[in-house]
């Protein structure tokens, strides 16, 4: 199932055997997730990320560096050759479901019923259906019907 291991040489893992903890160690701070969100929405240049998030330059520089080191983003020379662009790697693109699930959770729990918010739509302008995990037979699963198998 794993495609590529993150470039995380020298990292100290919060919980080495837990995929959730490792993912959060790699991308879990607020600014990194917002940068990933914006990269998925077309941000490429340093100034794109800065304007969209309002992040301070020094923090943005640090987060972009970390995301590159960890294999989430890569730096590419812009077509003009005058600046660097930041684009998602395959590992970064694989975070799409995480961003969508986070967005959908926020739509349900972080806004008042009549409060307006942005909406993620498909190519035809239709809002995405709610993400729901299923088992191997396609049946819905949730916290009550799953468990974690701890490898020994």
Predicted region positions:
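Canonical helix-turn-helix DNA-binding module
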Residues: 46, 50-77, 82
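N-terminal intrinsically disordered/low-complexity leader segments
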Residues: 1-15
């Amino acid at each position: 199932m794993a495609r590529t291991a993150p470039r995380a040489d020298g990292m100290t893992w919060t919980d080495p055997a837990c995929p959730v903890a490792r993912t959060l160690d790699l991308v879990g701070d607020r600014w990194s997730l917002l940068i990933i969100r914006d990269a998925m929405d077309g941000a490429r240049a340093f100034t794109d990320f800065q304007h969209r998030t309002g992040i301070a330059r020094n923090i943005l520089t640090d987060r972009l560096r970390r995301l590159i080191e960890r294999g989430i983003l890569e730096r590419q020379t812009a077509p003009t050759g005058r600046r660097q662009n930041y684009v998602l790697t395959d590992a970064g693109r694989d975070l799409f479901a995480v961003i969508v699930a986070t967005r959908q959770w926020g739509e349900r729990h972080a806004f008042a019923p009549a409060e307006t918010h942005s909406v993620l739509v498909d190519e035809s302008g239709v809002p995405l259906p709610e993400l729901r995990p299923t088992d191997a037979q396609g049946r819905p699963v949730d916290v009550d019907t799953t468990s974690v198998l701890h490898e020994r």
